[in-house]
Amino acid sequence: MSNPELSSEKKASLVETLKNKLQALAEQHVDVLESLAPVVRKRVDVLIEIQSQHDELEAKFLEEKSALEAKYHKLYGPLYSKRSEIVSGVLEVEGETEEREEKGVPDFWLKAMKNNEILAEEIHESDEEALKYLKDIKWCRIDDLKGFKFEFFFDTNPFFKNQVLTKTYHMIDEDDEPILEKAIGTEIEWHPGNCLTQEVLTKESLESTKPITKTEEYESFFNFFSPPQVPEDDAKIDENTVEELQNQMERDYDIASTLRDKIIPHAVSWFTGEAVQDEDYGASWVDDEEDDDDEYSDEEA
């Protein structure tokens, strides 16, 4: 399994770096307070106390929200199961009597995901044939409701042996906010010659009897199951590497959030394209609001 979890040494190093940054921010915070006039400082102190009370309420809200989401996720379960049976052709809808060779709803999940802008960028033409065998996607909470896990169910196919591909996100609490600790994906057992994520190229060597092999990496949706990894060599973790790794992990989490919060609960709307229209309308409404604000500002000026 691919695992971006940091070693204890790297964790300690990163924690120390974060502590230093937090210390610098704290010192900056103190400088701001000390620069205030005494009477203003008293008012700000009261505002800080109000904010503290707000944060306590917000923490309770997030706790209750998480429990409520878990409750309704269980209630959604039977609906998702029935949807899966119809999509895969296990269950026929009432009133359908005509015998047909085609079962279920072909390419349901492939089309649903391709209609989403974020996921469409991850799905390449070479992925599509394999994703036609995808018959269901599920997710569930883990780690006391903090983390979550995906399960991708596939029919028997010529690409890989796995019937189920999983991706697990382990989260930790950081100032009452869930922070990604690590992500673990299934190691895909590709059938020979059908790997979509990489290819081993071989050519003869002029200097040796042994052939030269080179692994060519390919862009693929199935790289989702191989989360970004931290280099083993600490010397390679420079500022650019850290920034690139952070961008990769943020992108990976965006994909996961899209699957969890949009695609799975509203799959048929993404399949038909209705969800795309709703998102486009929402984006258009925001743009219109911003344009109105700009016009208002110009008139004032």
From Swiss-Prot:
The modification Phosphoserine is found at residue 297. Residues 15-69 form a coiled coil. The keyword Phosphoprotein applies. Changing residue 297 to A: Abolishes phosphorylation by CK2. It comes from the Eukaryota. Disulfide bonds: none annotated. GO terms for biological process: double-strand break repair via homologous recombination; nucleosome assembly. Its main location: nucleus. Residues 279-301 are annotated as: Disordered. GO terms for cellular component: cytoplasm; nucleus. InterPro entries: NAP-like_sf, NAP_family. It is found in: Nucleus; Cytoplasm. Transmembrane segments: none annotated. Keywords: Chaperone, Coiled coil, Cytoplasm, Nucleus, Phosphoprotein. Signal peptide: none annotated. A motif (Nuclear export signal) lies at residues 36-51. One of its GO terms (molecular function) is histone binding. May modulate chromatin structure by regulation of nucleosome assembly/disassembly. The acidic domain is probably involved in the interaction with histones. Belongs to the nucleosome assembly protein (NAP) family. This is Nucleosome assembly protein 1;3. It comes from Oryza sativa subsp. indica. The gene is NAP1;3.
